[in-house]
Amino acid sequence: MDKLKIEASGALAGNVVISGAKNAALPILMAGVLAETDFNVSNVPNLRDVNTSCELLRCLGAEVTRSGTDKVCISTTNLNEFCAPYDLVKTMRASILILGPLLARYGTADVSLPGGCAIGARPVNLHLQGLEQMGAQIEVQEGYIKARVDGRLKGAHIFMDMISVGATENLLMAASLADGETIIENAAREPEVVDLANCLIAMGAKIEGAGTDTVRIQGVESLQGCDYRVMPDRIETGSFLVAAAVTRGKIRCTKADPKSLEAVLAKLEDAGANITTGDDWIELDMQGKRPKAVNIKTVAYPGFPTDMQAQFCVLNALAEGTATITETIFENRFMHVPELSRMGATMELEGNTCIIHGIERLNGAQVMATDLRASASLVIAGLVAEGTTIVDRIYHLDRGYEHIEDKFKGLGGHVERVKS
């Protein structure tokens, strides 16, 4: 099992090219099941979760071809299996997103209950309730969701009890091939949801209101393949910007999307960073200054993203002052705190709030990644810690960051992948 070995690196400097968004690519790849002709997707990151998604589609009988560094072509001509097995689904929670497309196009789907990061329960009930409102018969038996529909799904007026990105995406895809109009209220507004909707529209779907809390979908008879480019990864972008802020450096993120990161950029400015942006780039300059502590509360988009919470824990650990970070999206999402404490960070947990007292420096240590974003925070901490930091279990990192050690090296970071 690989590890990352990290040495104190000084101020990061230079340009880093941002990859396609994992959280947009995964539902877009699943949407390929809806297309009757070849579906070509570009700017697809080379990640463990993307590879799992491609393997899942192949398991169903789809032909999946990867070309170049970022292109995937999906053909469903020979798709003849409708079961997403446990061995694949257990490693990736986003596998649940195959449920809506299979059910909408083929009328049947058996999907193992999902795995992925160990961040709270994250139940799938919102996905199932919405599909049942659209006429699906659903049972959960022996760890599998078994869904059937006679004929086509029917449009429905769905009010979601809580905001769920995954459920919004599943219902968007299912409703695109349903009879009649579907209205989703209290829908997720995340940019990745909008990216999926734009992709479905390019395939022939009729969708209005994506990016607002009320989305209307008029079902169509069929969807066709198209050429679609996945949006930039806003969380990868934010992670590199925080790393630059913590190391008091100056970097430019290219092929980025500033509009999708407004809440994060505002907090970085509060921390003392100079931020400049263009249409597809973001530059951060700390001018050698120590960051200031910033209070954070994670909320659904367009608020501060939960996927950036761990990285800001590191920023506040080294900042001037005391800050609180409150997590309102997922329970059990402070598993990085004990690991950062091993490196000398001064942090206290009170329920869903972390109180962080900034200190001058961290110390290198052997630490363990517990989930995807926590692992990124440990890498950032290692860049500024005195001595050597070893991050174990980096398979979490490989689920969401493409060539992270190479990108940090390009900015002057001393990061090396080593075998156990």
Curated annotation (Swiss-Prot):
GO terms for biological process: cell division; cell wall organization; peptidoglycan biosynthetic process; regulation of cell shape; UDP-N-acetylgalactosamine biosynthetic process. InterPro entries: Enolpyruvate_Tfrase_dom, Enolpyruvate_Tfrase_sf, MurA_subfamily, RNA3'P_cycl/enolpyr_Trfase_a/b, UDP_GlcNAc_COvinyl_MurA. SUPFAM superfamilies: EPT/RTPC-like. Keywords: Cell cycle, Cell division, Cell shape, Cell wall biogenesis/degradation, Cytoplasm, Peptidoglycan synthesis, Pyruvate, Transferase. This is UDP-N-acetylglucosamine 1-carboxyvinyltransferase. Cell wall formation. Adds enolpyruvyl to UDP-N-acetylglucosamine. It is found in: Cytoplasm. GO terms for molecular function: UDP-N-acetylglucosamine 1-carboxyvinyltransferase activity. It comes from the Bacteria. The active site is at C117.
